[in-house]
From Swiss-Prot:
This is Tetraacyldisaccharide 4'-kinase. The gene is lpxK. ATP binds at T49, A50, G51, G52, T53, G54, K55, T56. Pathway: Glycolipid biosynthesis; lipid IV(A) biosynthesis; lipid IV(A) from (3R)-3-hydroxytetradecanoyl-[acyl-carrier-protein] and UDP-N-acetyl-alpha-D-glucosamine: step 6/6. GO terms for molecular function: ATP binding; tetraacyldisaccharide 4'-kinase activity.
């Protein structure tokens, strides 16, 4: 009943949000608002809904693909959760220059996992691209990947990829703030590629694909590739080898949009999740919210287990990990794998830099 009343209160704001988004899209579609065309090829990876689609692992996959074929890619991201403003150079492709507090947790993770890529954060993606063109004038990247930029239409793109969470593909078709849609569902028609993520029901994925057929050139499907548990701790303290996940007793914690997927992945690895504690997506860790986790884990003999992006957020906060003396900490590494459409997507990505 409370949720229903809240939805009724939020509905006028959602209607206004949807109207503004629709008018804005119409102005771009009719050429009344112009998009700036970068001389460097641009690939955009985004979504229709707010949070929790598996977009960041796909950005990582695309980065690694371009590096594997000898290209020099760059990423421009907003840098959600960062404590900095304007355009910031996170990595120049040789050295990582900023930590997670000034770059954002996801951006810090992308830079660390792809050290040869240029990584920039900017509220306005076009400003980030222009910065790259000036800063790397003599050695410009071959391609720029826009992270979470489907709605950022001021910057033209050569390939538009939208990630769709197949568990809740269009978040019950309700606009923000009543639901999670950032724009009307019809916006999917601007995309070249739709990537279905978090598939648990193939028949539901089939139905989504059938609905999208004709609107996009390719509908691809992904799966979560569950990696190792990687131990971490304060700099200078030796960490234990990779723990055996089978039977590991854990206090699982994270500040992400879809914590249920994280817990499911831990359980698939054989981790015994004894306790769970979750925070808002990108919420900063402080002594006030992290120390209770450490104390509970120490008291109950549990290992602290979190996500890779939460690890980078923790490592960016001076002094926090020093409080974990006597308590094991590790993060679960995940990646994107494809069950359908990988080769076709690679062809499309290659065509962007070839043309």
């Amino acid at each position: 009943m409370h949720e229903r009343r809240l939805n009724i209160l939020l509905r006028p704001a959602a209607l206004l949000y949807g109207l503004v988004a629709a008018v804005r899209n119409a102005l771009f579609d009719r050429g009344m608002l112009k998009a700036w065309k970068s001389p460097i090829p641009v690939v955009s990876i985004g979504n229709l809904t707010a949070g929790g689609t598996g977009k960041t692992p796909l950005v990582d996959w695309v980065l690694k693909y371009y590096l594997s074929i000898g290209c020099r890619p760059a990423v421009v991201s907003r840098g959600y959760g960062r404590r900095s403003k304007g355009v910031q150079l996170v990595s120049d492709g040789r050295n990582i220059l900023l930590g997670s507090t000034r770059s954002g947790d996801e951006t810090a993770m992308l830079a660390a996992n792809n050290p040869e890529a240029v990584v920039v954060v900017a509220e306005q993606r076009s400003e980030g691209v222009q910065f790259i063109m000036e800063r790397f004038r003599g050695e410009r990247p071959d391609v720029i990947i826009l992270d979470d930029a489907f709605q950022h239409r001021q910057l033209a793109r050569d390939l538009d990829i939208v990630v769709i969470n197949s568990r809740e593909p269009f978040a019950a078709a309700k606009m923000l703030p009543e639901g999670r849609l950032r724009e009307p569902k019809s916006g999917i028609g601007r995309a070249d590629v739709a990537v279905l993520s978090k598939i648990t029901d193939e028949s539901k994925a089939d139905a989504i694909e059938a609905e999208l057929t004709g609107s996009v050139a390719l509908v691809a499907r992904t799966r979560v590739v569950i990696g190792e548990l990687s131990p971490f701790g304060p700099k200078g303290r030796s960490t234990a080898p990779h723990p055996d996940p089978a039977g590991l007793k854990a206090l699982a914690f994270a500040g992400i949009a879809s914590p249920a997927s994280f817990v499911e992945s831990l359980m698939k690895k054989g981790v015994h999740v004894v306790e769970q504690r979750f925070f808002r997506d990108h919420e900063p860790y402080t002594l006030n919210n992290f120390l209770p986790l450490v104390e509970e884990a120490r008291r109950k003999g549990l290992t602290l287990v979190t996500t890779e992006k939460d690890r980078y957020r923790l490592e960016g906060e001076p002094g926090l990990l020093e409080k974990t003396e006597g308590v094991g900490c590790c993060c679960l590494n995940i990646a994107t794998g494809f069950t359908r459409g990988a080769e076709k997507l690679q062809e499309m990505l290659k065509a962007v830099v070839r043309d």
